Amino acid sequence: MYQIYTDRFCNGDPSNDVLTNEYCYIGEPVHRVEDWGRYPAQMDVREFYGGDLQGVLDKMDYLQELGVEVIYFNPLFVSPSNHKYDIQDYDYIDPHLGKIVSDEGELLPDGQRENRFASRYIDRVTNKANLEASNEMFAQVVAEAHRRGMRVILDGVFNHCGSFNKWMDR
């Protein structure tokens, strides 16, 4: 079994990377990490390395050469953290890990901490085209894994979600 923490695995599609100041998480702006060799920050749940499902597809030969029989994915659903355990939407794969086909809106202005102004993030993670394309990307990963005789386990954490989600009436 090979566990994949997708954000830290392989960046196969830089166009879907979380951008610095795209939104705030736990009161501070998120940050895109350029140097994969850099030591992680203390509050590194706000740091994104850009690994994605395209990167997993790109490394399927490598995984097969290792003799991987099962790929165990950390959560992949829409979530503001890099670990994805605080899920916003269980229906869709996070477009930052999948595919972004619509990329409208603005980054947060310097000093702004309110995500209602994070229009680029809102578009990226709520636009139906992005969400559907991301689910399709995951289906491609699963199909390719199965074609190679590998099985896929998804860490679904269905017993809890993040506080920023579509079910809370605020």
Q: Where do the language-model regions lie?
A:
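N-terminal structural segment of carbohydrate-active enzymes
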Residues: 1-151, 159-169
